[in-house]
């Protein structure tokens, strides 16, 4: 046989020394392929010779990706060695250009990772010739859609193995068992039940957080070297039967299994959400393309706060430490939507997340400069605006935050608009900050995107954000401060600000007849707001508290921190 690859398929069919099979060989299914083998009913060795070449022998044709049969989102380079998913999280099934041999390692290098999705590569084999498969007939997912058809076997690679730069090798042995190896680690049993009587093509689904892969030169594994210790330990009853139970284990690959870094944890109550469904939900909350240059700053407050995964993940190692504050590595841009995902929640109870912006460059601060509570940041001399996400948060939730040209910070929660949360001065550089509270112990920056104002469906402006009357204008300036931000324990002390330049003075709510007179003073929380601070024009104090604050040393506005030159009492017209 030598290296003549064309003789490989004839090996299992042309061996006269083997006994005939107990089932017909000429039956075809609706796709034109053979029916699944029922060899699991017989507990003896398979009665065929798998296509195994002598040691060191590989086909002359290199192993490449099939140039035509691929998912609609796949982009392939001219060498047919590298593929990339251009958008979404699915429609990225690929095949090898030729059948692989028994014990031939299919070696892949992960070249691109996109952390906003759940799940990773799906790897396996098929006995169907990809040249006879129309690309339009390929389903979105290898698991469970493709593996539910005869002649396809695949399983999900655990997420902790799907890091950029990792080299994954997988192969099938003569007993239909599939093994994999990550880099130079030990050989692990992946799944079993592959029918080796027919030629097998490699199947690679560039799914979920795996965005791009590259095929490396294949190698043969010597059978004598395949004695992984983990095989005996991992051989569960569900792996003893080779056909039906393999189907079951492959279908279960669609379940959401938490990774080592705690990402994509399933909800605490009820059944785990399948990754396909979870990603479909996320795709409604995320744009097709995300920029990945935004990271967390190295500065963090809290002895147990860690910045991980190329500075995209902030984790609190011990939930008892409430001093958990992190910043973005650069100022956010106007109209740039920042997407953040809650990737770990420490219990069934919902947690809380503070967010805000500051004009203070984190690079000029030390951890000791930061207060114990994020809401106490407003006592610093720089501009800080902080509040908490309204409503409960759970693992898997995605938040979108954007500061528009008017200085309004809008929030979306899983694609649903939550309205304007803060008013800030968009003319200055603004770093975003996050504070983790309670059971929220890990967040991840998924990326960012700049969309046109009318092109942000997940972040529509609330009615209060486009005021046309003095009453509406007063609502815009006071709602984020006194209503929305009061969802946190000290939220009212961490309000937002309108632009504090002189040109913003005409927009200050100084007109009688405002609709928010029932709002409480941010100092005493007893009397209604009835005082305008000069020169910034903010209304957040009662007259008595305003007088006391004005007499204080270095008196400044609680919102924008500008010096207080005077206070003006206002009266409501009857």
Curated annotation (Swiss-Prot):
Domain of life: Eukaryota
Enzyme class: transferase
EC number: 2.3.2.27
InterPro entries with a match to the protein in the record: B30.2/SPRY_sf, Neuralized, NHR_dom, Znf_RING, Znf_RING/FYVE/PHD
Catalytic activity: S-ubiquitinyl-[E2 ubiquitin-conjugating enzyme]-L-cysteine + [acceptor protein]-L-lysine = [E2 ubiquitin-conjugating enzyme]-L-cysteine + N(6)-ubiquitinyl-[acceptor protein]-L-lysine
Record PTM text: Myristoylation is a determinant of membrane targeting.
Record keywords: Cell membrane, Cell projection, Cytoplasm, Lipoprotein, Membrane, Metal-binding, Myristate, Notch signaling pathway, Repeat, Synapse, Transferase, Translation regulation, Tumor suppressor, Ubl conjugation pathway, Zinc, Zinc-finger
Zinc finger (RING-type): 520-560
Residues with a covalently attached lipid (N-myristoyl glycine): 2
Physiological role: Plays a role in hippocampal-dependent synaptic plasticity, learning and memory. Involved in the formation of spines and functional synaptic contacts by modulating the translational activity of the cytoplasmic polyadenylation element-binding protein CPEB3. Promotes ubiquitination of CPEB3, and hence induces CPEB3-dependent mRNA translation activation of glutamate receptor GRIA1 and GRIA2. Can function as an E3 ubiquitin-protein ligase to activate monoubiquitination of JAG1 (in vitro), thereby regulating the Notch pathway.
Protein name: E3 ubiquitin-protein ligase NEURL1
Organism listed in the record: Homo sapiens
Gene: NEURL1
């Amino acid at each position: 046989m030598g290296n003549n690859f064309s003789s490989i398929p004839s090996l299992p069919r042309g061996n006269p020394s083997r006994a005939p099979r107990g089932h017909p060989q000429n039956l075809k299914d609706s796709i034109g392929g053979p029916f699944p083998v029922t060899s699991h009913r017989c507990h003896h060795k398979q009665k065929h010779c798998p296509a195994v070449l002598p040691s060191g022998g590989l086909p002359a044709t290199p192993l490449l990706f099939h140039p035509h049969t691929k998912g609609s989102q796949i982009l392939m380079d001219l060498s047919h060695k590298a593929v990339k998913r251009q958008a979404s999280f699915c429609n990225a099934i690929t095949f090898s250009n030729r059948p692989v041999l028994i014990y031939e390692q299919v070696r892949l290098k992960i070249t691109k990772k996109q952390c906003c999705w759940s799940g990773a590569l799906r790897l396996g084999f098929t006995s169907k010739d990809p040249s006879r498969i129309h690309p339009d007939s390929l389903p979105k997912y290898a698991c469970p859609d493709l593996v539910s058809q005869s002649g396809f076997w695949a399983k999900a690679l655990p997420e902790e193995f799907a890091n950029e730069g990792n080299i994954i090798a997988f192969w099938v042995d003569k007993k239909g068992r599939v093994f994999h190896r990550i880099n130079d680690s030990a050989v692990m049993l992946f799944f079993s039940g592959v029918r080796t009587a027919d030629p097998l093509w490699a199947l690679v689904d560039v799914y979920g957080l795996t965005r791009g892969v590259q095929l490396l030169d294949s190698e043969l594994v010597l059978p004598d070297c395949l004695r992984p210790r983990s095989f005996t330990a991992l051989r569960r009853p569900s792996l003893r039967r080779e056909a039906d139970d393999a189907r079951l284990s492959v279908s279960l690959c669609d379940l959401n299994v938490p990774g080592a870094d705690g990402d994509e944890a399933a909800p605490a109550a009820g059944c785990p959400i399948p990754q396909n469904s979870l990603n479909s939900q996320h795709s409604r909350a995320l744009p097709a393309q995300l920029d990945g240059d935004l990271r967390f700053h190295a500065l963090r407050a809290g002895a147990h706060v860690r910045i991980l995964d190329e500075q995209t993940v902030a984790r609190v190692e011990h939930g008892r430490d409430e001093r958990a504050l992190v910043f973005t590595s650069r100022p956010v841009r106007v109209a740039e939507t920042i997407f953040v995902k809650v990737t770990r929640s420490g219990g069934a109870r919902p947690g809380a997340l503070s967010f805000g912006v500051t004009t203070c460059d984190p690079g000029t601060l030390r951890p000791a400069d930061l207060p114990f509570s994020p809401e106490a940041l407003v006592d610093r001399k720089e501009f800080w605006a902080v509040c908490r996400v309204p409503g409960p948060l759970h693992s898997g939730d995605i938040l979108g935050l954007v500061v528009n040209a008017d200085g309004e910070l809008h929030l979306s929660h899983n694609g649903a608009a939550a309205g304007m949360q803060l008013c800030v001065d968009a003319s200055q550089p603004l770093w975003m900050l996050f504070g983790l509270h309670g059971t929220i112990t890990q967040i991840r920056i998924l990326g960012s995107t700049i969309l046109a104002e009318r092109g942000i469906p997940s972040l529509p402006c609330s009615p209060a954000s486009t005021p046309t009357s003095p009453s509406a204008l007063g609502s815009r300036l006071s709602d984020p401060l006194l209503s929305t931000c009061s969802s946190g324990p000290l939220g009212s002390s961490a309000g937002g600000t309108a632009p504090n330049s002189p040109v913003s003075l005409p927009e200050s709510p100084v007109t009688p007849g405002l609709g928010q007179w029932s709002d409480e003073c941010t100092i005493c929380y007893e009397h209604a707001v009835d005082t305008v601070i000069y020169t910034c024009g903010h209304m957040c104090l009662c007259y008595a508290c305003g007088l006391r604050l004005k007499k204080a040393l270095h008196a400044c506005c609680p919102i924008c921190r500008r010096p207080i030159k005077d206070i003006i009492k206002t009266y409501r017209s009857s």
